[in-house]
C-alpha cells in the first residue's frame, strides 16, 4: 500500500501505463493474427495489405519498448517470409 503522496501518484501512473501498454500489446497480437488468418485463407492481396499495417503496429510498440526490438524484428521477418511464400506459391 502506498503511504506517501509520491508513492500514491507513482501507483496511479503505473496502473495507467499498464492499461495503455496492455491495449497496445493486444493490438500487436491482433495484427499478427489477422495477417496469419489471411495467409491461411490464401488471400494474397489482403495478406500484403494487413502485413503493411501490422508492420507499423509492430514498429510502434518496439519503439515504445513494450516489446523488445528483437522480438519485433523476429515477428516481422516471419510474417514477411510467410507473405512472400504465399506470393511465390500463387506465381506457380
From Swiss-Prot:
GO BP field: translation
Molecular function in Gene Ontology: small ribosomal subunit rRNA binding; structural constituent of ribosome
Keywords: Ribonucleoprotein, Ribosomal protein, RNA-binding, rRNA-binding
Region Disordered: start-end pairs: 1-25
Lipid metabolism in keyword set: no
Regions crossing the membrane: none
Keyword rRNA-binding: yes
InterPro entries xref list: Ribosomal_bS20 (IPR002583), Ribosomal_bS20_sf (IPR036510)
Gene Ontology CC terms: cytosol; small ribosomal subunit
Family statement drawn from the similarity comment of this UniProt entry: Belongs to the bacterial ribosomal protein bS20 family.
Biological role stated in the UniProt entry: Binds directly to 16S ribosomal RNA.
Protein name as it appears in the record: Small ribosomal subunit protein bS20
Organism: Burkholderia mallei (strain ATCC 23344)
Gene this protein is translated from: rpsT
Amino acid at each position: 500500500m502506498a503511504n506517501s503522496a509520491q508513492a500514491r501518484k507513482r501507483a496511479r501512473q503505473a496502473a495507467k501505463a499498464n492499461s495503455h501498454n496492455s491495449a497496445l500489446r493486444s493490438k500487436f497480437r491482433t495484427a499478427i493474427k489477422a495477417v496469419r488468418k489471411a495467409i491461411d485463407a490464401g488471400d494474397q492481396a489482403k495478406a500484403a495489405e494487413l502485413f503493411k499495417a501490422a508492420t507499423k503496429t509492430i514498429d510502434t510498440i518496439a519503439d515504445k519498448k513494450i516489446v523488445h526490438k528483437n522480438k519485433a524484428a523476429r515477428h516481422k521477418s516471419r510474417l514477411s517470409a510467410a507473405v512472400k511464400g504465399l506470393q511465390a506459391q500463387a506465381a506457380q
